[in-house]
Structure formats: structure tokens, C-alpha cells
Amino acid sequence: MATRQSVDHFLEQCEGALHFAEFEFNEASRQEHYDDEQFQNSQKYIEEALTDMERLYASSNDQQREMLSRMKQQLNQLRNEMILLRH
């Protein structure tokens, strides 16, 4: 069973990855190929967060799963937007 603290800590990490990726997405939208490495790193952080989430999800209770599902939806949405961006 996942502890509340471990889920909260993980969600904070996801928020960090989400904010970093949003920043890079906005920069890439304006500057195209200025900093491809940072853009790719932000995509990698999203992928890692989604992978780690699957492991944590399996040992979470219903309330924790709901919080993780919401974060997963946000991460997936941004990941898809980044993929579709003509960068």
C-alpha cells in the first residue's frame, strides 16, 4: 500500500515535470528549434513520470488512484500537445 506521503511527494514531482514541460512547450511554440535538447528532456520527464505512476498506481487506494488519474490525464494531454507541435 502506498503511503499518503509517497503519493504526495510523487505528485509534487509530477507537478514539477508538468511545469517544466509547459514552459518548454511555450518556448518551442514561439522559437521553433531554438533549444531542442531542453524540449526533448521535458518530454522524457513526462514519460518517466507516467511510467513511475503505473507502479505507484498498483499499490494505491481509491482516493490516491483518483489523484494519480487526474495527474496522468494532465501529463498525457501535454505530452500529446508536444508531439503535435511542429517543432
What are these regions (language model features)?
Residues 4, 61-65:
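Short, structured coil/loop segments at alpha-helix boundaries
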